[in-house]
Amino acid sequence: MVVKQKADYAALKEELIAYAYEIGIQKIGFTTADPFLFLKERLLEAEALDLFTGFEHPVIEERVYPELIFKEPQSIIAIALAYPSKLKEAPVSKKGARRGVFARASWGIDYHTVLREKLALLETFLIERLPDVRMKSMVDTGELSDVAVAERAGIGWRGKNTLLITPEYGSWVYLGEMITNIPFEPDTPASDLCGSCNQCVKACPTGSLLGEGKMNPKICLSYLTQTKDFLDEKYREVLHNRLYGCDTCQVVCPYNRGHDFHFHEEMEPDPELVRPELKPLLHISNRAFKEQFGDMAGSWRGKKPIQRNAIIILARYKDKTAVPDLIDCLQNDPRPVIRGTAGWALRKIGGRDAEEAVERALQTEQDVQVLQELTAIPN
């Protein structure tokens, strides 16, 4: 197919939509390559308030103006893949074998990989029909905002939890986009259907959701579970059983109720991986961690945040069977964050063995932050 006329582009768009559904893409939408000026205001406000986490693309102008990252852009294609929200035969956390949880966005194979494969198929489809086409695809970590593109492309609207909500799949969707030099006709942007509902804002464990689709990402549990430093004690108290990520604002959303999608085999979770026992995590080697969890999105920060979070969860459960493992962490782990968090956990759990281990550590520990964990009064 040689595309030259506007009618040809319209036909190509319909062909591409049909192909997208054929390869397992749940939603596809099209928008212009115009600047995302509304996003610029929001980003500048966030920058002024020091709300960037460091996980975002650092150049605001490149997040707003597609022409800065792609020569003569004509349109942007957005896609959405729905993912599961419920486990089949979920393992039970029980005394002596407590478990933590990975958020749903870490179930199955890393979603970045799955989305990139779908976008690559769309790229091949277009190249076969339009040899001179130019494209730039991105997922999550690219310059553009996935939610902003998808919203303007008509796939869904930005909810008060800052996530994209679709009428069909709620917010249980992964997003990706492709900038092209093809002048596809844009779709109509989605309407905001949240109305007066504030359930996600009220349910947020840390108060990170500010309403009107705004948030303080630095106190979002999803972000905090991925940090590598000591976790502030006030956030340890609300960590509950989260090893990676947080789904609270999605679970309470009315548009997500009753939704559970199993369209993609790659996204099917291994229950033992997404709800693993905690104690074995404390001593897992780097190699074993990569072998067991390396294909999951939740492994991208390495084992340290997961281990720190596992220690905090064990303390919350006051799991006395974990005391020997925690003592070993306190005495032998070379990382101050793990030693200090283990010492805090031992004081939280209590008992003679735990208390004696902390007293011994106070005689030998040199790290100031670890010593603070060993002496501060736990809540």
Swiss-Prot record:
It comes from the Bacteria. The gene is queG. The lineage of its organism: Bacteria, Bacillati, Bacillota, Bacilli, Bacillales. It comes from Listeria monocytogenes serovar 1/2a (strain ATCC BAA-679 / EGD-e). Keywords: 4Fe-4S, Cytoplasm, Iron, Iron-sulfur, Metal-binding, Oxidoreductase, Queuosine biosynthesis, tRNA processing. InterPro entries: 4Fe4S_Fe-S-bd, 4Fe4S_Fe_S_CS, ARM-like, ARM-type_fold, PBS_lyase_HEAT, QueG, QueG_DUF1730. The active site is at residue 140. Binds 2 [4Fe-4S] clusters per monomer. The keyword Cytoplasm applies. HAMAP family: QueG. Belongs to the QueG family. Catalyzes the conversion of epoxyqueuosine (oQ) to queuosine (Q), which is a hypermodified base found in the wobble positions of tRNA(Asp), tRNA(Asn), tRNA(His) and tRNA(Tyr). Transmembrane segments: none annotated. This is Epoxyqueuosine reductase. Its cofactor is cob(II)alamin; [4Fe-4S] cluster. Gene3D superfamilies: 3.30.70.20, Leucine-rich Repeat Variant. [4Fe-4S] cluster 1 binds at residues 194, 197, 200, 253. It is an enzyme of class 1 (oxidoreductase). NCBIfam families: tRNA epoxyqueuosine(34) reductase QueG (TIGR00276).
